[in-house]
Structure formats: structure tokens, C-alpha cells
A protein has these predicted regions:
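Charge-rich, low-complexity N-terminal segments
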Residues: 2-127
């Protein structure tokens, strides 16, 4: 059996937030041109090798603490007014989350954001 320190693992933490937005590029009269809201689901994935002593890549409490600040900046907000997002598309929100999380989560591997009720999502891997 391989040693745990030789294994690379992907671990993740999910969170949700509620927010409103409109898409400035949507044609007049299109539903996305008007303010509307969504329930968003986010999965933050980290890649790394487990510590041989603890067996952990990262403690989930530490990951949750890093995520809390980013979530707070989005939950029950009007996304068009958040500095750094630009047009509030799934793509731009994923990039915004990445830039907020990376300083606290250097092993960040992936940000997956979706609107489950719309069956739409975006995965950003920092490239």
C-alpha cells in the first residue's frame, strides 16, 4: 500500500449564497437585463498531499474560515455593485472568488460555481 505522504488528494468544501444581479450586456427586454436573484452553490477544491502525522491535506475548519470572508462578501448582495467582479457572470464571480481565496488557500485547485435551479455552472482552475 502506498504511503499517505506519496498520495495527492483533492478535498473540497461547499457553500451557498443568495444574491441579485442583472447583465448589462443583455438586450433590452431580455429577462437578464432586469434585476433578478439566484441561489448560488460553490465548491472550493484544494489539491495536496496529506500530512503524514495528521492525515489531513488541510483542516476543514481552516478552509471554512477562509471561505467565510468571501461568502460574506457575496451573500444577500447586489453583485453589480461589488468591486472587482465587473459584469456579474458565473465566470467573473468564479475569478473573483479565486482571487479572494488564493492568498489564504495557496493549494487552491478549483472553484466551481453553479446556479442549480438553472442547471448552469462554471469551473475555474486559475488559468
Amino acid at each position: 500500500m502506498p504511503h499517505i505522504e506519496d498520495m495527492t488528494m483533492l478535498i473540497y468544501k461547499d457553500f451557498t449564497f443568495e444574491a441579485a444581479h442583472f447583465l448589462p450586456s443583455a438586450p433590452p427586454g431580455h429577462p437578464n437585463s432586469r434585476i433578478h436573484g439566484h441561489s448560488f452553490h460553490v465548491r472550493v477544491t484544494i489539491e495536496g498531499k496529506p500530512d503524514p502525522k495528521t492525515g489531513l491535506v488541510v483542516h476543514f475548519d481552516d478552509l471554512a474560515a477562509a471561505i467565510a470572508d468571501a461568502r460574506e462578501g457575496l451573500d444577500h448582495q447586489f453583485l453589480n455593485e461589488i468591486d472587482g467582479i465587473g459584469a456579474p457572470t458565473l465566470e467573473n464571480i468564479a475569478i473573483w472568488l479565486w482571487s479572494r481565496l488564493l492568498p489564504q488557500v495557496p493549494a487552491l485547485s478549483e472553484v466551481h460555481i453553479s446556479r442549480p435551479s438553472c442547471h448552469e455552472g462554471c469551473i475555474y482552475r486559475g488559468k
